Amino acid sequence: MVNNSQHPYIKDGWFREINDKSFPGQAFTMTVDSILYEARSEFQDILIFRNKVYGTVLVLDGIVQCTEFDEFAYQEMITHIAMFAHSNPKRVLIIGGGDGGVLREVAKHSCVEDITMVEIDSSVIELSRKFLPTLSNGAFDDERLDLKLCDGFKFLQDIGASDVHKKFDVIITDSSDPEGPAEAFFQERYFELLKDALNPNGVVIMQSSENFWLNLKYLHDLKNTAKKVFPNTEYCYTMVPTYTSGQLGLIVCSNNANIPLNIPQRKISEQEQGKLKYYNPQIHSSAFVLPTWADKVINE
């Protein structure tokens, strides 16, 4: 274990997430009981520590990715909003998501026949399986999984306008925030690649990296960027205590303009609902309802 005082993101026993670009004038902090892992992979700084409230915490490049305590609020919403917005998803693509949480949730759908997961950093997968095993909960051993260790952007470029057998019903983008190499995942070209990789009636969902308390103009611009490519684009959100302002926005798109993305297209069985902590049909729809002032900006 590393002494707390030696890590650049930790001072006086407190982890500090500070970003003057995304949330100037404020910071998110939590105490560090012990550091479980700290090193730089080929792609990013990785920090894993214990907190008495949130349990094990995964931090990439100084940004909290997930904690044992509240991870389900993000994993379930980014997964099941997209999965239930499709009437019969059989082929699913996950871009990023190395902690395994989204994979765990996708694997709960018995209708799914093939899961392709593209993660550039194998270290995140290995460390998450070691220190955060409940996130994947064995899903990396699912026989439906085809795990590819490569860049998600290039993977989509290689699909291009290929035959329908290589395309997907649902694509879930669980990428890092739009800084450095990940910035490409929030631009118009990326949405074009997503559309090319979708089957008819396909659904795409991605985390926006922001929420309406922090940067309304950014969310407005991001949604409009997606709308240039997809005829059906909506914004919704989920509540996660360890994300800045306790909230994270999601962009949901479809190449079918007639699909009401805010309404589940399949009924959830009692058995399926019993496996979930956060998502339900009511919260699916309510997640698209925004406060008046935010709705005017984001959806204008």
UniProtKB/Swiss-Prot annotation:
UniProt keyword list: Phosphoprotein, Polyamine biosynthesis, Transferase
Entry binding sites for S-adenosyl 3-(methylsulfanyl)propylamine: Q44, D99, E119, D151, G152
GO molecular function terms attached to this record: spermidine synthase activity; spermine synthase activity
One Pfam short name: Spermine_synth
Pathway in which the depicted protein is active: Amine and polyamine biosynthesis; spermine biosynthesis; spermine from spermidine: step 1/1
InterPro entries tied to this protein: PABS (IPR030374), PABS_CS (IPR030373), SAM-dependent_MTases_sf (IPR029063), Spermi_synthase (IPR001045), Spermi_synthase_euk (IPR030668), Spermidine_synt_N (IPR035246), Spermidine_synt_N_sf (IPR037163)
Phosphoserine carried by residues: S5
GO cellular component: cytoplasm; cytosol
EC assignment: 2.5.1.22
GO biological process: pantothenate biosynthetic process; spermidine biosynthetic process; spermine biosynthetic process
Catalytic activity: S-adenosyl 3-(methylsulfanyl)propylamine + spermidine = spermine + S-methyl-5'-thioadenosine + H(+)
Residues forming the catalytic site: D174
Highest taxon in the source lineage: Eukaryota
Amino acids binding spermidine: D177
Keyword field contains Cell inner membrane: no
UniProt domain PABS: residue ranges: 12-255
Broad enzyme group: transferase
Entry keyword annotation includes Transferase: yes
PROSITE patterns per UniProt: PABS_1, PABS_2
Additional notes on this entry: Present with 3870 molecules/cell in log phase SD medium.
Protein family according to the UniProt entry: Belongs to the spermidine/spermine synthase family.
Name by which UniProt lists this protein: Spermine synthase SPE4
Species of the source: Saccharomyces cerevisiae (strain ATCC 204508 / S288c) (Baker's yeast)
